[in-house]
Amino acid sequence: EDLIDIVTSLPNFPVDTDITPHLCDETYGSNMAPLPPIVIPEFEPSGTIDPAPSDAMIDQLCNATVAAGEINAAAYTVDCPRLDQYHLFADAEDPSSLPNGQGVPFVMNTKLFSDYATKYRVAYIPKGEQAIYRDGNDNANAAILFPVGTILAKTFSFTNETNQTEVAAETRLIIKRETSGGQYYWDGLEYIWKEENGEKVAYLTQQGGVMSASWDYSDVKSGDHYQGSTDAYVLPNAN
C-alpha cells in the first residue's frame, strides 16, 4: 500500500524552483555559520581488489566490431575512453536518440531539479537476463535487482526552445560489475560532451569539470518559462 501511495501521488506534486526561501541572507538577515572543513582520509581499499585492466585489453574491448543496432556489451567490464565505444545510442553524437540493443528509456516518479537541465535516462539489461523486482518485505523499501552487465545511462542537456536546439553537457553511466572473487559492485563513469572537428564526442572525465550553459524552455508540468545562463555549471567528480 505504501508503494502504491508513492507511485500514484508523487508525480502530482507541483514543481517548485523558487530559490528565494534558500537565500538566507536576504530572507532571514544572515547566513548560517560555516561548517568546519571536511578532511577526507587517504583511501584504503577493503578486501581483494582485482588488478586494473591493461591498456591492450581496454583497446580490444572498446574498439570491438559491433553489429548495427547492438551495444558493445562485452565492454561493460572496462572504462572506455569515449562514450560512443559502448554503442549505446542509434546516433553516436546524440544521447537523446533511440537506444541500441535492449535499451529501455525510463523516467523517475519523483521530481529532481537539476539546474535547469533536461535529463534522459536509459536502462540496458544484458541479453538473456532480467531485472527482478524485490518487494523488500512488501514495504516502501522495495528495490530492483539488476544483473551483472547492466548499464544505466543518464544524460544532462540544455534546451533552447526559441532556437530549437539542445546541447548535451554530460552523460553518466552506472555499470554493474563483478570481481574475480564474486563480489558485485556498481561503477560510476562521467562522460563530458565536446565538439571536435564538427563532431560531438563524449570523453571519460572522472575528475569532472566546469562549463558554460544556457537554457530557454517552458516546463511541461507547471507551464513556467525558464531562461538564463551560467559560466559555472559543475560537471561532477565521479569519485
Describe the residue ranges of each PLM region:
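Residue-level preference for alpha-helix termini and adjacent loops
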Residues: 112, 122, 157, 232-234
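Short, conserved beta-strand segments within well-ordered enzyme catalytic domains
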Residues: 124, 153-155, 172-174
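Sequence/structural signature of beta-propeller domains
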Residues: 1-150
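Extended, Lys/Arg-enriched charged tracts that mediate electrostatic binding to polyanionic substrates
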Residues: 143-162, 168-169
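Sequence context surrounding c-type heme c attachment/ligation sites in exported
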Residues: 1-56, 161-239
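Short regulatory "switch" loops immediately downstream of catalytic or recognition motifs
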Residues: 127-132, 158-160, 177-178
